[in-house]
Amino acid sequence: ASRERKEFYKYPKIIKCEKDYFWRTSLSFIPSQSLLKRLLFQSIKRAHSKSEALSNYLFSIYTYDDPLEINNIFSTSKPQEKSIPLITFNCNKDCNPIEDIHESVIHSHIFIESKALFAVLTGITHWNNYEVGSVYQVRRVPDKFEPTMQAFLNFLSVI
């Protein structure tokens, strides 16, 4: 039998975001915005062919190079209003994912380190690993979970 905890866990005073992830130490370069965009176009084409989304669900991806930038994202209530996305695309299987950016039912804004995005798009890691490890931050408008969007994201890679 287990005992009930009477005291709360003690929170650390500082949460380090400089953890050396495998993808961070494996990549000896910071991927350029143009390289990431080319990989995203290929990945979106691949994921769109497997899409099950029937409505306009949009993703916008924002990248940053400095791992400490995540602190600014955490401390801002609507960071998407202060940033320019690298790309915005539609998950709707009946639309052109790049050209048909209409009013959306849900719009998810993903904030991710450039190296992490490169690693997930090239198969070094997988989106599910990032979700568990809190590697990227998402702001949904409205804040509703849509399973077909998550499924789309799981196929978002070039391999």
In which residue ranges do the predicted regions lie?
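Feature captures hydrophobic
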Residues: 1-159
